[in-house]
């Protein structure tokens, strides 16, 4: 995978607006299905998840499909890394150069060789005695904490605390990533690490304490493509409509807020639920009853071999909208966003929805990239709110 250049638009001397292009990866799910390896992969994931049932409060991350990457550097001189830009977690971590496992190196058939961080080659790295361990939905990583100079998009944090991973779950070995940069709230951070965004705000490096995510759309998600733009310090007025609907956050852990109502076809639900916006989750997560309603309204069929709900690809543009009511406004998601061509064969496409279970103490919904591609998300840290504006896509 080729790296890409970060574009920095510097404003005043004391603060800035920074626009960082993202890159959308090839879908791991589509790749494994195409190579006939998906069934074995599912079995390994089920075994891993069975061991994670008692992990408690952890970030929501799903790296099975298209997700969005950015370039950073760490250390002096700078060492590059390509990381997931993830609003569903709050820690930054990269891979230790001393880790020699296949997961740390990248599996040969992943088509990507990991960029690792060599602490011995940075004159500004400070190793801490504290260890770190993070359990994500798709696997874990652990190692030790340290501090060094972080740069992303022309923004610099002089002493950013981050994880240096000495062990990665196998799933990360299949992905073209070198780490994760969490954009969630400090309360979600493991080991009370201060996230990069909070450090930037404290150092008054941004025009405004917010960032905007615009994700581009490609009907064929099996291949990696340019993925969108993150604007730090301002609202993206080029790729997002001018009208922004804001809603106060109901918790400052995830980017969590209330969902007033949901409808699809002839089905509607007015029970209020808690939902999170998460760039690290590819699809839409919903309660069991909602997933069942979507399946019924779209006439989807469950494919046991892939554990996916499928419909005919010919219906990609004609299935009913998924209509979310947030802050008193309706946000319809077109079927072209939630019916995905994963090259399953037989003219079948997948529904980009998954079950969150039947409820509990946490959020009941995840609005992942399927929703964010249709609506720019404005993550307003300063005012404790999130905003939504219609995304502009050329040629679609």
UniProtKB/Swiss-Prot annotation:
User: What does the induction field say?
Assistant: Up-regulated by B.thuringiensis endotoxin Cry6Aa (at protein level).
Task: Report the Gene3D superfamilies cross-referenced here.
Answer: Acid Proteases
Gene deletion effect:
RNAi-mediated knockdown partially prevents neuronal degeneration in a mec-4(u231), deg-1(u38) or gsa-1(Q227L) gain-of-function mutant background.
Where in or outside the cell is it found? Cytoplasm; Lysosome; Secreted
Q: Which UniProt keywords apply?
A: Aspartyl protease, Cytoplasm, Disulfide bond, Glycoprotein, Hydrolase, Lysosome, Necrosis, Protease, Secreted, Signal
Q: Which GO terms describe its molecular function?
A: aspartic-type endopeptidase activity
Please list which residues make up the signal peptide. 1-15
Catalytic center at which residues? 86, 278
Q: Which Pfam families match?
A: A1_Propeptide, Asp
Q: How does it assemble?
A: Interacts with B.thuringiensis endotoxin Cry6Aa; the interaction prevents Cry6Aa proteolysis by host gut proteases.
What's the name of the protein?
Aspartic protease 1
Q: Which gene encodes it?
A: asp-1
């Amino acid at each position: 995978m080729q790296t890409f250049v970060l574009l920095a638009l510097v404003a005043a001397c004391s603060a800035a607006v920074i626009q960082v292009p993202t890159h959308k990866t090839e879908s791991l799910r589509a790749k494994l299905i195409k190579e006939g390896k998906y069934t074995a992969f599912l079995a390994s994931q089920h075994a891993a998840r069975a061991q994670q049932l008692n992990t408690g409060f952890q970030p929501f991350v799903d790296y099975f499909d298209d997700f969005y990457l950015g370039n950073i550097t760490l250390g002096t001189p700078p060492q590059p890394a390509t990381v997931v830009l993830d609003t569903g977690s709050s820690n930054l971590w990269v891979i230790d150069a001393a880790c020699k496992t296949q997961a740390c190196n990248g599996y040969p058939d992943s088509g990507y060789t990991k960029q690792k961080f060599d602490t011995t080659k940075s004159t500004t790295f400070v190793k801490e005695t504290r260890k770190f361990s993070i359990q994500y939905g798709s696997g874990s990583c652990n190692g030790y904490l340290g501090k060094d100079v972080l740069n992303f998009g022309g923004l610099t944090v002089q002493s950013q605390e981050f994880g240096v991973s000495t062990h990665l779950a196998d799933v990360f070995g299949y992905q073209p990533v070198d780490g994760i940069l969490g954009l969630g709230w400090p309360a979600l951070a493991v080991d009370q690490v201060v996230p990069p965004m909070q450090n930037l705000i404290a150092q008054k490096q941004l025009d405004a304490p917010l960032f905007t995510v615009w994700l581009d759309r490609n009907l064929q998600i099996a291949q990696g493509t340019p993925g969108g733009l993150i604007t730090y310090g301002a609202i993206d007025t080029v790729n997002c409509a001018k009208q922004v609907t804001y809603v106060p956050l109901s918790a400052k852990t995830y980017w969590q807020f209330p969902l007033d109502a949901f409808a699809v076809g002839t089905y509607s639900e007015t029970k209020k639920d808690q939902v999170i916006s998460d760039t690290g989750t590819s699809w839409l997560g919903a309660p069991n009853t909602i997933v069942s309603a979507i399946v019924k309204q779209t006439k989807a069929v469950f494919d046991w071999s892939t554990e996916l709900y499928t419909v005919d690809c010919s219906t990609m543009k004609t299935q009913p909208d998924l209509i979310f009511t947030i802050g008193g406004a309706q946000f319809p998601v077109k079927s072209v966003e939630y019916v995905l061509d994963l090259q399953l064969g037989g003219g079948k496409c997948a529904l980009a929805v998954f079950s969150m279970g039947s409820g509990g103490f946490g959020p009941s919904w995840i609005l992942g990239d399927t929703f964010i591609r249709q609506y720019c998300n404005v993550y307003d840290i300063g005012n404790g709110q999130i905003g939504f504006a219609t995304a502009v896509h050329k040629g679609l």
